[in-house]
Amino acid sequence: MKLRGLYAITDSQLLAGRFLTHVEAALEGGVRLLQYRDKSDDAARRLREAQALQKLCERYGTELVINDDAELAARLGVGVHLGQTDGPLTPARALLGRQAIIGSTCHASLDLAAQAASEGASYVAFGRFFNSVTKPGAPAADVGLLAQARGQVKLPIAVIGGITLDNAAPLVAHGADLLAVIHGLFGADSAQEVTRRARAFNALFAS
């Protein structure tokens, strides 16, 4: 399974009132990986929304991962993305099986990436690369890290943090496999603009 292209991440506040329409618009433009990210404690709504996203992803051939909730991922039979505060990846791999996509937040640390690889990660995520609305205090990373990671970590590399169409191209040029985008995709005013942005992000991988 090749993980390369646009990695769309949902934001429940940003997408309030237009959640499924804007997500489907992104999928229409081409999304390799979709992460359902919701930090609320409304388990019933989270299950409902995740199930709706799963149906959309199946329709468009997109892989779905759940943020920070391996149990919900297991219930749906999808992947999971874990941060550094979520514990080791090994239990999630045991729960979800060998084929599941499991991603790991590595901030700007090659050591964390190596550890994630040893614990069975499917991809590693570095960032923030630019000022981020979602995680303004996250450790900063730069393109030099990508060159080092390419030589040391034999996994797909996701990049995150303030990524827009104006700043994404150098990240792809320096070895990023997945552009993880929230506001730069879903901050659009219309569903049509979301689709246009998704296509434009994917075009960066074709050049």
From Swiss-Prot:
Residues where Mg(2+) binds: D68, D86
Binding site for 4-amino-2-methyl-5-(diphosphooxymethyl)pyrimidine: Q35, Y36, R37, D38, K39, N67, T105, K135
Gene3D superfamilies linked to this entry: Aldolase class I (3.20.20.70)
A GO BP entry: thiamine diphosphate biosynthetic process
Binding site for 2-[(2R,5Z)-2-carboxy-4-methylthiazol-5(2H)-ylidene]ethyl phosphate: S132, V133, T134, G162
UniProt pathway: Cofactor biosynthesis; thiamine diphosphate biosynthesis; thiamine phosphate from 4-amino-2-methyl-5-diphosphomethylpyrimidine and 4-methyl-5-(2-phosphoethyl)-thiazole: step 1/1
InterPro entries per the UniProt record, alphabetical: Aldolase_TIM (IPR013785), ThiamineP_synth_sf (IPR036206), ThiamineP_synth_TenI (IPR022998), TMP_synthase (IPR034291)
Origin: domain of life: Bacteria
GO molecular function: magnesium ion binding; thiamine-phosphate diphosphorylase activity
Cofactor binding, note field: Binds 1 Mg(2+) ion per subunit.
Catalytic activities: 2-[(2R,5Z)-2-carboxy-4-methylthiazol-5(2H)-ylidene]ethyl phosphate + 4-amino-2-methyl-5-(diphosphooxymethyl)pyrimidine + 2 H(+) = thiamine phosphate + CO2 + diphosphate; 2-(2-carboxy-4-methylthiazol-5-yl)ethyl phosphate + 4-amino-2-methyl-5-(diphosphooxymethyl)pyrimidine + 2 H(+) = thiamine phosphate + CO2 + diphosphate; 4-methyl-5-(2-phosphooxyethyl)-thiazole + 4-amino-2-methyl-5-(diphosphooxymethyl)pyrimidine + H(+) = thiamine phosphate + diphosphate
CDD domains in UniProt: TMP_TenI
EC numbers, comma separated: 2.5.1.3
Claim: Nucleus is one of the keywords in the record: no
Essential cofactor(s): Mg(2+)
Keyword annotations: Magnesium, Metal-binding, Thiamine biosynthesis, Transferase
GO CC terms: cytoplasm
Family matches, as NCBIfam families: thiE
PANTHER family assigned: THIAMINE-PHOSPHATE PYROPHOSPHORYLASE, THIAMINE-PHOSPHATE SYNTHASE
Assigned protein family: Belongs to the thiamine-phosphate synthase family.
Function text: Condenses 4-methyl-5-(beta-hydroxyethyl)thiazole monophosphate (THZ-P) and 2-methyl-4-amino-5-hydroxymethyl pyrimidine pyrophosphate (HMP-PP) to form thiamine monophosphate (TMP).
Record's protein name: Thiamine-phosphate synthase
Gene transcribed to yield this protein: thiE
